[in-house]
């Protein structure tokens, strides 16, 4: 006498556990997404605004750069209220021949070793930029970027947790931040 053939589960029975796990994962992902802040999607190049001076600049959104950098000309260190500060100029985006003077406390000085082997000191300041609808503050190195296409480079330190970059797009969102008191 032969043993009865084992009954094979139906397609529905075999897929049901997998489908339930999938739905649970999707529900959990949706809840996590709703509970956290939404991420703004921006292009590889965007207009950003230096909040304190209300100056709009075109910036490269660079996910490959750890920190942000700003084209700074005629840098001059000085002391104010017992702290080290720096005065520098940026090119006026409305008039290439004009300059706008900014002053910030120096957070630190970083030494960068260049490809040529020489090292370069760069002052680092805290900068608040309006990027899309976000006011984001992060350390920004001051360097001469006049030979580069963009005066401003926004790195991951400014974008992390707030911005996703679509590298195939540009100028997706103009700077439009709420006032300081909101």
Predicted segment positions?
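Pepsin/retropepsin-fold aspartyl endopeptidases
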Residues: 32-182
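Bacterial N-terminal signal peptides
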Residues: 14-27
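N-terminal secretory signal peptides that target proteins for export/translocation
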Residues: 1-12
